[in-house]
């Protein structure tokens, strides 16, 4: 089982309050563990304010200031000072991994200098920190019914309001969210 390019959708009975109601985009999953970014946990800072704090200068005039008003997200509890940009591929950046034809993850500062300019990706999400699992840990959490899994779609990441992402991911599985129980069971 490889959950790269899938969403982890927290079940109502999620024991860890940090991840309650979370939707996590899985960037990497292999025998060594897994790494992902929460896509529905905004923090109290905009992309524009973050760029000012880290003193990133644009490579082109910033013509699209409105795009900088979007929130920065809490990607997870690990390396919270490290940034990850989930975006639609447009250009090559120093440290990018193309996940699909429609989605890439970049960790290098060069992408920050194009945000708000004509060169920015058409859609993007900036996250600080990431969520990580050691070998076998995520698989154990799946057995414990902590997560639902579903193939990721850019529409849920970029086109769905933040407060609706959990619900939309559950509905994409064909499940009525009101029918999910916090009690785990095994048949």
From Swiss-Prot:
InterPro entries: AlgH-like
Family named by the database record: Belongs to the UPF0301 (AlgH) family.
Pfam families: DUF179
Domain of life where this protein originates: Bacteria
Coiled-coil portions: none
Protein name: UPF0301 protein VP2612
Gene3D superfamilies the record matches: VC0467-like, VC0467-like domains
């Amino acid at each position: 089982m490889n959950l790269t390019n899938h969403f982890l959708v927290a079940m109502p009975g999620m024991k860890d309050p940090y991840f309650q109601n979370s939707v996590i985009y899985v960037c990497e999953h292999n025998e060594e563990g897994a790494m992902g970014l929460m896509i529905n946990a905004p923090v109290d800072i905009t992309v524009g304010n973050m760029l000012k704090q880290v003193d990133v200068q644009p490579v082109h005039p910033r013509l699209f200031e409105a795009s900088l008003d979007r929130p920065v997200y809490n990607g997870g509890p690990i390396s919270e000072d490290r940034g990850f940009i989930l975006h639609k591929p447009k250009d090559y950046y120093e440290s990018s991994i193309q996940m699909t034809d429609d989605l890439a993850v970049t960790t290098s500062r060069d992408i920050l200098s194009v945000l708000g300019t004509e060169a920015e990706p058409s859609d993007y999400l900036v996250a600080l920190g990431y969520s990580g699992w050691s070998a076998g840990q995520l698989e154990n959490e799946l057995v414990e019914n902590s997560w639902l899994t579903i193939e990721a779609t850019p529409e849920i990441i970029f086109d769905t309001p933040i407060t609706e992402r959990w619900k939309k991911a559950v509905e994409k599985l064909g499940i009525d969210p009101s029918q999910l129980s916090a009690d785990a069971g095994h048949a």
